[in-house]
């Protein structure tokens, strides 16, 4: 196996393992809040952690879940250049969705996906974060805000990258970045299938709802 292939495989493996760290579960257990998988929706992400009533814990989960997506992409850059950033970032999202440590039952990839966007295409990431915040603040439904943000990510990659802005994955290969963001968006949408059904039925829970 040559050096390039070795670096690629290490980036994918490292991204997956980093993404699979269940920070929400770890933090709730360490804080005495219990097993987050038995609280609220059972999801290990920040929105469900917020249902414990501990805002600081939810914020920390959000930052760590986003951080591991960004870290996976940026560490891959040091390993083998920007060409490895997007594959490693996607691997991190997959790791969060299907963590080996939890029987491949993980979160929904929103914070981790946004972390990847911020690391590989910060203008797109910032716009998507702002879009998530605006929608969430307006209608108080986290899932709808997330779906809206990721739906626009591929289009934003084409628009912003087409102007030559952002890090190399965006400025130099905006079509590839758009394709990668489309894949992340598809994964996020698939993991939100139940949420989408509840949104259509008008029964989706709102941000801050206690378990």
Curated annotation (Swiss-Prot):
Reaction catalysis annotation: an acyl phosphate + sn-glycerol 3-phosphate = a 1-acyl-sn-glycero-3-phosphate + phosphate
Transmembrane feature ranges: 8-28, 84-104, 116-136, 145-165, 170-190
Gene Ontology biological process terms in this record: phospholipid biosynthetic process
Pathway annotation from the record: Lipid metabolism; phospholipid metabolism
Main location: membrane
EC number annotated for this UniProt entry: 2.3.1.275
Membrane topology: Multi-pass membrane protein
InterPro entries per UniProt: G3P_acylTferase_PlsY
Annotated compartments: Cell inner membrane
Keywords in alphabetical order: Cell inner membrane, Cell membrane, Lipid biosynthesis, Lipid metabolism, Membrane, Phospholipid biosynthesis, Phospholipid metabolism, Transferase, Transmembrane, Transmembrane helix
A GO molecular-function descriptor: acyl-phosphate glycerol-3-phosphate acyltransferase activity
A single cellular component GO annotation: plasma membrane
Assembly behavior: Probably interacts with PlsX.
Similarity section: Belongs to the PlsY family.
Known function: Catalyzes the transfer of an acyl group from acyl-phosphate (acyl-PO(4)) to glycerol-3-phosphate (G3P) to form lysophosphatidic acid (LPA). This enzyme utilizes acyl-phosphate as fatty acyl donor, but not acyl-CoA or acyl-ACP.
Protein name: Glycerol-3-phosphate acyltransferase
Taxon lineage: Bacteria, Pseudomonadati, Pseudomonadota, Alphaproteobacteria, Acetobacterales
């Amino acid at each position: 196996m040559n050096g390039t292939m070795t670096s690629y495989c290490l980036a994918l493996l490292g991204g997956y393992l980093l993404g699979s760290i269940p920070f929400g579960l770890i933090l709730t257990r360490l804080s005495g809040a219990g097993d987050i998988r038995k609280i609220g929706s059972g999801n290990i992400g920040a929105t469900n952690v917020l249902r414990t009533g501990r805002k600081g814990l939810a914020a920390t989960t959000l930052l760590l879940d986003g951080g591991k997506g960004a870290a996976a992409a940026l560490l891959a850059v040091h390993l083998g250049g920007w060409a490895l950033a997007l594959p490693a970032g996607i691997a991190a999202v997959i790791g969060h969705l299907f963590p080996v440590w939890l029987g491949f039952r993980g979160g929904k990839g929103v914070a981790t996906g946004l972390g990847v966007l911020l690391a590989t295409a910060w203008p797109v990431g910032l716009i998507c974060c702002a879009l998530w915040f605006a929608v969430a603040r307006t209608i108080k439904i986290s899932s709808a805000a997330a779906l809206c943000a990721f739906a626009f990510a591929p289009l934003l990659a084409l628009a912003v990258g087409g102007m030559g802005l952002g890090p190399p994955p965006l400025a130099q290969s905006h079509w590839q970045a758009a394709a990668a963001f489309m894949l992340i968006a598809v994964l996020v949408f698939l993991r939100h299938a139940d949420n989408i059904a509840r949104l259509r039925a008008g029964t989706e829970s709102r941000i801050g709802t206690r378990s």
